[in-house]
């Protein structure tokens, strides 16, 4: 059999890549031609390989550094790099402004333009952008219903949600979003549903009283896991938008002027359906962050979350003349 040179190997499609990394207190560098992260324990350094060809995004938290050579290799492999705070918290906080994640996207000049052209075809029209936002919310609701009621893995793990109460919450939200006259009402309804879902999840896992804390200020396990898991969703969302060549600033719901708003729009497609229940399950089990993170990654992979994000973006983008 003839040898195959590295240049002849096929690139793994982003939607089929298996890895998403969140790292803290380590150095990312190139060692022996491979991208690795290094952790120090006393006088010893441990080197861990990052399979960049099978990785979608890399989130760097507190105490991390990365070399220019590593950034070059990650960009070449199409891996998005995001800088965030520790434990899945905002990178910077200043008065009213939080920078959730500062993204460095691979600067390939060969990104597709088809979806960008279709996206801007409706984006400048307020009403069409509202219709697109409704489409995102419909997809979110269907994902919540499917995951919470039909995911056997969640059910076997002990997530015993009240099916009737969930159905009522989803139906109420569906009616409200169809009647929402503007983006502000849609955002209000999104927050209202999330509050109901938090209550249902707390009841399903017997967590007790729960209040969602903002900006990483929560001290209880469920709040910490929610913050951490949401950043994994941001990583996939940033990858999905970059793959299709749609800039992160072209949001349909989270504000035209909010930095990276489209990433939050896309992440919301799966946060409540996949991250939220796992946060409560892991909190009740007493999981460590690494255990929770792995459970989330398993959920995201099993549910083909990145495929779902990309397909939803395509569906909206292809409606150049979006109609209600």
UniProtKB/Swiss-Prot annotation:
Its cofactor is Mn(2+); Mg(2+). Changing residue 254 to A: Protein is unstable. Inhibited by EDTA. Mn(2+) supports cleavage of ss- and dsDNA, while Mg(2+) only supports digestion of dsDNA in vitro. It comes from Pseudomonas aeruginosa (strain UCBPP-PA14). This is CRISPR-associated endonuclease Cas1. Keywords: Antiviral defense, DNA-binding, Endonuclease, Hydrolase, Magnesium, Manganese, Metal-binding, Nuclease. HAMAP family: Cas1 (MF_01470). Homodimer. This bacteria does not encode Cas2; Cas1 must interact with a different protein to insert spacers. Gene3D superfamilies: CRISPR-associated endonuclease Cas1, C-terminal domain (1.20.120.920), CRISPR-associated endonuclease Cas1, N-terminal domain (3.100.10.20). Its EC number is 3.1.-.-.
């Amino acid at each position: 059999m003839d040898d195959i040179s590295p240049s002849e190997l096929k690139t793994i499609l982003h939607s089929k890549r298996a890895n998403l990394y969140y790292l803290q207190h380590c150095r990312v560098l190139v060692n022996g031609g491979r991208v690795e992260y290094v952790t120090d324990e006393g006088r010893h350094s441990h080197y861990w390989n990052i399979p960049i060809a099978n990785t979608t995004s890399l989130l760097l938290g507190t105490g991390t550094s990365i070399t220019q050579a590593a950034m070059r290799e990650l960009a070449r492999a199409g891996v998005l790099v995001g800088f965030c705070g520790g434990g899945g918290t905002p990178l910077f906080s200043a008065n009213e402004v939080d920078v959730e994640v500062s993204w460095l996207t691979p600067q390939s000049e060969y990104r597709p333009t088809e979806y960008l052209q279709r996206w801007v075809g409706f984006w400048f029209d307020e009403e069409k952008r509202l219709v697109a936002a409704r489409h995102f919310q419909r997809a979110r609701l269907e994902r919540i219903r499917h995951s919470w009621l039909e995911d056997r893995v969640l059910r076997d793990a002990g997530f015993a949600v009240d099916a009737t109460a969930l159905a009522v919450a989803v139906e109420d939200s569906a009616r409200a979003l169809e009647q929402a006259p503007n983006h502000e009402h849609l955002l209000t309804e999104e927050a209202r549903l999330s509050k109901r879902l938090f209550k249902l999840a707390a009841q399903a896992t017997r967590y007790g009283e729960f209040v969602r804390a903002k900006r990483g200020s929560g001290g209880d396990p469920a709040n910490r896991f929610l913050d951490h898991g949401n950043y994994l969703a941001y990583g996939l969302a940033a990858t999905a938008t970059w793959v299709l060549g749609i800039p992160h600033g072209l949001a349909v719901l989270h504000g035209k002027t909010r930095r990276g708003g489209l990433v939050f729009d896309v992440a919301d497609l799966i946060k409540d359906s996949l991250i939220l229940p796992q946060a409560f399950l892991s909190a009740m089990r007493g999981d460590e962050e690494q255990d929770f993170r792995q459970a989330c990654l398993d959920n995201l992979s099993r549910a083909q979350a990145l495929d779902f994000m990309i397909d939803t973006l395509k569906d909206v983008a292809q409606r150049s003349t979006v109609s209600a």
